Amino acid sequence: MQRATRASILGSIAIAAALALPTGSAMAAGQGPGYTCTGGDFATNTFTTIPSATYASITVTGACNIALNAVINVTGNINVAPGGVLDAQSAPSTITVGHNVIAGSGSLLGLGCQPANWIGMFAGVPCAAEPTGHTTITVNGNVSATNANTVLLRMVTVHGNVSLSGGGGDIPWSIKGDTIDRNLTISNITADWLGAQFNKIAGNAVLTNITATDPGDPGRTVAVVENTVARNLICFGLEPGVSGGFIPGEVNHVGHQALGQCAALV
């Protein structure tokens, strides 16, 4: 019941985020000093919408989403400030980031939506605003989050590293279907649930000190499912345990070594 209720709440949030008209205030400067997105209220499903444009940078301090079918080019960084919300996972869009995506303490970073059958065995998450649509998101640098409340990365191309350290909350963390040209590092997170699934990682994948707290299902574990890792897959301190998936054959494919709790998941 708790899981169903949470799913319903998250669905409502996603739909509201996708369909909300711009509210609050936002400052755009095209290719000038950048764009600061303010306003919105995540608690009431009110969002400021970021429109199509080329920006020097984007800074998110409020609750912000992406316009339906927007084409956004950011020559520098996207910064989600502490407590900010960036919902780029509810409406189809094309987003290209020249440098890095950085999420601060207590923030929510959501990137990517697609038809269910685009990732693994129906592991994709459809765009709430247009279920048959999809996002195309490319980050030419790194994606990093420090003490974030929630991080959702689905079918994102990252030409650098993905580094997630600390934080967590009542929303499941999902790192799935991504292409990561360097390393994936996830550490010191206590969240409802966390899954690293169906990713292609050119370097190492290191998951340490992660706790899944889902109160509705005591059997819930950290999921490490069908990733292709060119170098090493390393897992330590995953509580209450680690799962390799429910379908036979959903093992991870590792070029060098699988160590720790993930040694048996290859």
What is each stretch, according to the model?
Residues 12-22, 142-145, 246-251, 255:
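Hydrophobic alpha-helical membrane segments, chiefly transmembrane helices and signal peptide h-regions
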Residues 33-52, 63-72, 83-96, 107-138, ...:
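Extracellular beta-strand-rich, repetitive "passenger/adhesive" scaffolds
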Residues 74, 78-80, 97, 101, ...:
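Fold-core signature of tandem repeat domains
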Residues 1-29:
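Secretory targeting and sorting signals
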Residues 163, 185, 206, 211, ...:
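General marker for long, soluble alpha-helical cores
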